[in-house]
Amino acid sequence: PPPNPEGTRQARKNRRRRWRRRQQQIRSISERILSTCLGRPAEPVHLQLPPLERLNLDCSKGTATGVGSTQIPGESCAVLGSGTKE
C-alpha cells in the first residue's frame, strides 16, 4: 500500500522516497524473473481485443456466447441486467 499521509512534511517525503525505491526493486525483481525463468519480456504483449459489439450474453443457454466466456460459473445472467436504466 502507498505510504501513510500522516507525520511531518519531511517524514512523509522520506516515506514516499522509500516506498518508490521499494516499488522499483519489486519491478526490477519481477522483470528479472519474467525474463530469466519464463523467457519472456517484462513488457506486456499487446492483446488484440474484439469490438464490444461482437460480445453478447445469451441467458437462454445458460452460458456466454461470443468471444471467450464472460459469465462466472454459477452466476445467473439476471445479475448482470440488461444495461438499461429504468
Swiss-Prot record:
Motif (Nuclear localization signal and RNA-binding (RRE)): 8-24
GO molecular function terms attached to this record: DNA-binding transcription factor activity; RNA binding
CC per GO annotation: host cell cytoplasm; host cell nucleolus
Entry keyword Phosphoprotein: yes
InterPro entries: REV_protein
Compartments it resides in: Host nucleus, Host nucleolus; Host cytoplasm
Region ranges (Disordered): 1-25
Residues annotated with Phosphoserine modification: S69
Post-translational modifications: Phosphorylated by protein kinase CK2. Presence of, and maybe binding to the N-terminus of the regulatory beta subunit of CK2 is necessary for CK2-mediated Rev's phosphorylation. Asymmetrically arginine dimethylated at one site by host PRMT6. Methylation impairs the RNA-binding activity and export of viral RNA from the nucleus to the cytoplasm.
Domain comment (free text): The RNA-binding motif binds to the RRE, a 240 bp stem-and-loop structure present in incompletely spliced viral pre-mRNAs. This region also contains the NLS which mediates nuclear localization via KPNB1 binding and, when the N-terminal sequence is present, nucleolar targeting. These overlapping functions prevent Rev bound to RRE from undesirable return to the nucleus. When Rev binds the RRE, the NLS becomes masked while the NES remains accessible. The leucine-rich NES mediates binding to human XPO1.
Subunit and partners: Homomultimer; when bound to the RRE. Multimeric assembly is essential for activity and may involve XPO1. Binds to human KPNB1, XPO1, TNPO1, RANBP5 and IPO7.
Reported function: Escorts unspliced or incompletely spliced viral pre-mRNAs (late transcripts) out of the nucleus of infected cells. These pre-mRNAs carry a recognition sequence called Rev responsive element (RRE) located in the env gene, that is not present in fully spliced viral mRNAs (early transcripts). This function is essential since most viral proteins are translated from unspliced or partially spliced pre-mRNAs which cannot exit the nucleus by the pathway used by fully processed cellular mRNAs. Rev itself is translated from a fully spliced mRNA that readily exits the nucleus.
Name assigned to this protein: Protein Rev
